[in-house]
Amino acid sequence: MSRPTVSPGSLAEQAQFAMLLEVTARGKPGNIDRCHDYEDTRLDHFLSSAVLAQPIFSAMEAGTLSFGDSMREAVARTNMHRGGNTHFGAFLLLLPLIAGKGIAGATELVKKTTVTDAVLFYEAFGLTQVRVRTEDPMDVNDPASIQRLKDEQITMYSVMEYSAPHDMVAREWTNGFALTRRAADLLFAQKGGVHAI
């Protein structure tokens, strides 16, 4: 008997599923997974974030939120638990992929981000506890940096270009999501392709 053809779901659902799969994977040295928690952040905080982010993912897929708005709202919604930063980096990767309807579209979309997107990104950083280099002239925790973004008309993409030499997620934005593409290619090469899971 053949298996019925099943839709892989909306992009928002796929992003949510990716977040759930990532955190429940086994054997992630140094990271939270189903067998390892930190004192102040646990698996259930990550699971909560994946659920709480869904409306933002759906709004991005529908095109009703800008990148900056979606980043700020995703962080605000997922701060409803006490576990601190759970998915900031995942949001930076997934939101453009959802809005761009895949890697090719995301690669073009990120280049069109605005100064307002950059300001909202900095505000999102302020809502979480992401560790950053404090000696950086564009320190996300320094209120003067937001004014600099406005004064110098620095877009979100420019922020990522600036950060790319020392930040893997920023590098994904500026190199066409190369690691994301490689991981996707590996998954599609598995028996079953999109239905491998």
What are these regions (language model features)?
Residues 1-65, 101-197:
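Phosphate-rich cofactor/ligand-interacting catalytic cores and adjacent structured alpha/beta frameworks
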